[in-house]
Structures are given as C-alpha cells and as structure tokens.
Amino acid sequence: KRPDGQGITLVNIGVGPSNAKTATDHIAVSRPHAWPMVGHCAGLRASQSLGDFCLAHAYLREDHVLDDDLPVWVPIPALAEIQIALERAVDQVTQLQGYDLKRVMRTGTVATIDNRNWELRDQSGPVQRLSQSRAIAVDMESATIAANGFRFRVPYGTLLCVSDKPLHGELK
C-alpha cells in the first residue's frame, strides 16, 4: 500500500465461475474502485495468434452461477473508462498503436462457460452459440466477474491473452 492507504490488490480467484462468484461476492463489501479481470482464454478466431490480447466489449454468460441473482437476459455493458485504461496498458507494454495495436488486440464478446472440457464434447451446440454471439474468446470467469460488478456497481473490465485455440487445433 501507498502511504495514503491506496493501492492495488491482486486476487487469484482460481479457476471457474463458482470461484469468481464467491470471491467477488466477498470482495464487493469492501467497495473496490474497479475489478479488472486479467487472465488467459481460448481464442476463437482464425486471425488470432497465441499471445494476442482480447479486450471484452460484451459478455456471453454460460456460467450458470448468477442466473438467480441476475438473469442472463440482462445486458452487461462494457465500461468506456475501463476499456480505455486496459487498451492504454496494452499500448504501453507493446509500444504499438493504431493498426499495429489492433493486429495483436481484438475487441469483442468474451464467452464464459462452466464446462472446462466444452471443446471435447459434441461441439454443435456450444460452437453454434459462440458463432452467433460473435465471441472472440472463451474463458471460465470474465462474464461472472463482469456480471457481479454490474450487480454490485463495481466498475469492471476484461483483458485476456490467447493461450490456446481449441477450434483450430492450437493448444497450450
């Protein structure tokens, strides 16, 4: 912490939407300034490469842990201030701007799913929903954190790094 008592706290929530919900439920009472989710994901677009960034501007909730508290039909909007801050962070780290930055950082829908092995099962259902939503990435926590941020009025955002591409045969 800084002398003024302000600072950044990093929380390793583990894996999965249940952990994300439990952690954010408990952290919300401390009234944090923001919940930036930083993690890894499965890239869904052929144009993505391992190591590329995904900046969520929408969320597809297939986590099933907040359905009773916040129905899935409630939209979870992206927050401009957080989006800009996360994009600037990537800009500073990569030293890229404009089109060069867009080549390594896609913006789009991030789908959060509760089944770690979704790509090993019959893909017709999940893949069709991911395609219809125009999702660029799949993870197991982002939409849960964003939904709880929306629910508790804590600003949220998501920046992920592509660690695998299961639909294209590129694994970690």
Q: What is each PLM-predicted segment?
A:
Residues 1-85:
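Metabolite-binding pocket within alpha/beta catalytic cores that recognizes anionic/polar moieties
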Residues 33-34, 136, 155:
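Short acidic/polar active-site loop segments enriched in Thr and Asp
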Residues 57-59, 130-135:
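Gly/Ser/Thr-rich active-site loops/lids in small-molecule metabolic enzymes
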Residues 62-65, 118-121, 166-170:
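Short acidic/His/Gly/Ser-rich catalytic and metal-binding motifs that mark active-site loops
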Residues 73-132:
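Active-site rim beta-loop-alpha module in soluble metabolic enzymes
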